[in-house]
């Protein structure tokens, strides 16, 4: 019997396939992106230690006050700028981008472009 896999399960499989190839190091940590139906999250992770070095999301109170909606492209752009600013303050300039199994389009692309514009290299 053939059972169709859910979109969420297919995204997880794509993410595992990507994670086989992408790892974050102390010199070049991983910029991981996750989006839910309501918010968008970004974190910079050192995979050798398993530590999150920097994080930002549209769930944060200071970002929500600046946004009309927490789930649109404008929110993703703001999260990208904030994550880049916080990373540069910690001395992180180069990262590896992990799209988290999501298509590189729309919100994910907007976050990546704004992080690049704010000074992160990837």
UniProtKB/Swiss-Prot annotation:
* GO terms of biological process kind: translation
Q: Name one GO cellular component term.
A: cytosolic large ribosomal subunit
CDD domains per record: Ribosomal_L18_L5e
One MF term in the entry's GO annotations:
5S rRNA binding
Stored Pfam families: Ribosomal_L18p (PF00861)
| Sorted UniProt keywords | Ribonucleoprotein, Ribosomal protein, RNA-binding, rRNA-binding
Sorted alphabetically, which InterPro entries does this protein's record hold?
A: Ribosomal_uL18_bac-type, Ribosomal_uL18_bac/euk
Gene3D superfamilies according to UniProt:
3.30.420.100
Task: Write out the function statement from the record.
Answer: This is one of the proteins that bind and probably mediate the attachment of the 5S RNA into the large ribosomal subunit, where it forms part of the central protuberance.
Q: How does it assemble?
A: Part of the 50S ribosomal subunit; part of the 5S rRNA/L5/L18/L25 subcomplex. Contacts the 5S and 23S rRNAs.
Family to which the UniProt record says this protein belongs = Belongs to the universal ribosomal protein uL18 family.
HAMAP family, from UniProt?
Ribosomal_uL18_B
Q: Please report the name of this protein according to its UniProt entry.
A: Large ribosomal subunit protein uL18
Query: What organism does the UniProt record list as the source?
Result: Dictyoglomus turgidum (strain DSM 6724 / Z-1310)
């Amino acid at each position: 019997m053939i059972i169709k896999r859910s979109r969420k399960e297919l995204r997880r499989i794509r993410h595992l396939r990507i994670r086989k190839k992408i790892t974050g190091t102390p010199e070049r940590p991983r910029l991981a992106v996750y989006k839910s139906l309501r918010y968008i999250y970004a974190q910079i992770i050192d995979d050798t230690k398993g530590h999150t070095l920097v994080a930002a999301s549209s769930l944060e109170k200071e970002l929500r006050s600046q946004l009309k909606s927490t789930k649109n492209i404008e929110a993703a752009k703001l999260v990208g700028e904030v994550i880049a600013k916080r990373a540069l303050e910690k001395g992180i300039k180069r990262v590896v981008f992990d799209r988290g199994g999501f298509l590189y389009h729309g919100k994910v692309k907007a976050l990546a472009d704004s992080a690049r514009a704010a000074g992160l290299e990837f």
